[in-house]
Amino acid sequence: MEIKKATLYITEMKLIIPFAASYGTYEKRESIVIELEDTDGYIGFGEVVAFSEPWYTEETVKTALHVLQDFLLLDLLKAEISHPNEVPSLFKHIKRNRMAKAGIEGAVWDLYAKRQKQSLATLLGGNRSEIEVGVVIGINTIPTMLKQIEKYAEEGYERFKVKIKPEHDYELLKEIRKEFPNIPLMADANSAYTLADTEKLKRLDEFRLMMIEQPLADYDFLDHAQLQKKIETPICLDESIHSLEDARVAITLGSCRVVNIKPGRVGGLTESVQIHNYCMEHNIPVWCGGMVEMGISRAQNVALASLPNFTIPGDISASSRHWERDIISPEVMLEGGKVRVPQSIEREYEVDRGRLEEITKQRIIFER
C-alpha cells in the first residue's frame, strides 16, 4: 500500500449529557478524524481520541495535530506498507504521542480491511459475532447517578462503571448497592487516590466490586502492587498501561489483576492485540475501555473486543449514549445488552460523510 493522500478533519460534537470524572467535566468533544487514500483508490478512516486538555495523558488535540502535520504524515506519505502491523515500526523514532499514532494506524487497518475484503474483527483475530458491553456513569449527585443506572439497566447494559473520587466514593457505592444489590459494578478512580488512602480503599471491599480501576497515579506500579496485597477488590490498570512493556511490568510486579486496553492509549490496534495476547498467556483478563469517542474509534473497539480474552464487558456503549447523531452508519446500537460485531466487509460501519462535514471546524490535506 502507498498512501497518496491524507486528510485531517478537526471536529467538535456536543455531548448529550456532560461527562464528569475525577479530573474534570466536559460538554463538547473535540477530535481529529484521519482519512487516508491509497494509490488504488481505497480509503480508510481513523480517529485521534486525545482530549482538548492534558488531563488523561499528556496528549491533546493540539499536540496531536502538531505531531501529525509535522512528523507522522510526512513519514507515512513516503512509505510503502504491506500490512498495518508495520506502522508502529515506521513511527518508532517518534517518542510517545501514541494517540496520534493510533489514529493513523486505525485508518491503515480500515483501508487494509477494505483491500482484503475482510472484516476488521476477522483480521485482528476476533472470534465472536456479538459482544457484551457496559456503560460509564460520570460523577454527579447520588440521586442522579442512581437514576442513570436505572435507565441504562432498562436499556440492557450488562455492566456498570461509576466514576469516584475521595469525597465521592463510599456513600455513593453504598447507595448503589442498596438500590441495585446484584448488578455487575466497578469503580473508576482515574488516579484520584494515593497509598495513604489504603484504609479508605479497603472499605470499598464490602461492595463486591468487579474491580477498582486506576486508583493510584499512572507511574505507581510499586504502590499499586502494595495496595493490591492489602485490598480484596481486584485492581485494574488503565492510565498505567501505555505499551506491552508496561503490561509486562504490571503483571510481573502484581500491580493488577485486570488490564484495560484502549487502542489510543497504547498506540494502536497492533499493540492492543499484543497486550491482549500477553495477558491471555498470563491469565489476566482484559476489557476494552472507552474515550468518549465518536463512531470511527467506537467501531474499531467493537472489532478489537471480539478477541477471546476480552472476557469483561467493555466501555463500548451505543452511539446514542453520547451523541444525538454519530458520524457512522449504522450507528453502534445496543440489542439485548450486546453490540453486533461485523463479520464481513459488506456489514462494516461506514463513515457518514454528511455528518462529518457538519461537525468539521477545519480540514487539512496532505498529498504524496
PLM regions and their residue ranges:
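C-terminal extensions of enzymes
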Residues: 321-368
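Metal- or metallocofactor-binding catalytic centers and their adjacent structured scaffolds
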Residues: 5, 37-39, 43-115
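N-terminal amphipathic alpha-helix/helix-capping segment at the start of soluble metabolic enzymes
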Residues: 1-5, 118-129
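Shared catalytic-loop signature of beta/alpha-barrel
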Residues: 219-236, 241-338
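Conserved, mostly hydrophobic/aromatic
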Residues: 34, 41, 104, 117, ...
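Metal-dependent enolase-superfamily TIM-barrel catalytic cores that perform enediolate-based chemistry
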Residues: 122-231
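A cross-domain feature marking catalytic cores of carbohydrate-active enzymes
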Residues: 48, 135-137, 162-164, 187-191, ...
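Structured beta-strand/loop patches that form or line metal/cofactor-binding pockets in enzymes
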Residues: 1-44, 49-55, 323-325
